Amino acid sequence: MSSQQQKQPCTPPPQLQQQQVKQPCQPPPQEPCIPKTKEPCLPKVPEPCHPKVPEPCQPKVPEPCHPKVPEPCPSTVTPAPAQQKTKQK
């Protein structure tokens, strides 16, 4: 008789656990509703903002700035005063 009593209390717990697992299955449908509003909001802001600022700004500043300063500067200032100073000494 003692062995039968031990088996009885072991069977009801599993049934209770199964019912608890079925309950959380109903609320999940509400979760998929949240990611739907966040998805269309993120891609709409960074897409038109990134390509419009760095594209026309980077190629227009470094191109005309680099060749205009280093070219005429070292060819007229460094060679002239450097030779005169060495001859005087």
UniProtKB/Swiss-Prot annotation:
Q: Where is the composition biased (Polar residues)?
A: 75-89
Sum up the protein's function in the record's words: Cross-linked envelope protein of keratinocytes. It is a keratinocyte protein that first appears in the cell cytosol, but ultimately becomes cross-linked to membrane proteins by transglutaminase. All that results in the formation of an insoluble envelope beneath the plasma membrane.
Locate the region 6 X 8 AA approximate tandem repeats.
Answer: 31-78
Q: Which GO terms describe its biological process?
A: keratinization
What protein am I looking at?
Cornifin
Q: Which residues form the signal peptide?
A: none
Any Pfam family from its record, for instance, is Cornifin
Q: Which organism is it from?
A: Macaca mulatta (Rhesus macaque)
| Keywords of this entry | Acetylation, Cytoplasm, Keratinization, Repeat
Report the locations given in the UniProt record.
Answer: Cytoplasm
**sequence repeat spans:** 3-14, 18-29, 31-38, 39-46, 47-54, 55-62, 63-70, 71-78
- Locate the region 2 X 12 AA approximate repeats: 3-29
State the family it belongs to.
Answer: Belongs to the cornifin (SPRR) family.
Q: Which GO terms describe its cellular component?
A: cytoplasm
**Induction line:** During squamous differentiation of epidermal keratinocytes.
Q: Where is this region: Disordered?
A: 1-29, 68-89
As stated in the Swiss-Prot or TrEMBL entry, residues carrying the post-translational modification N-acetylserine are 2
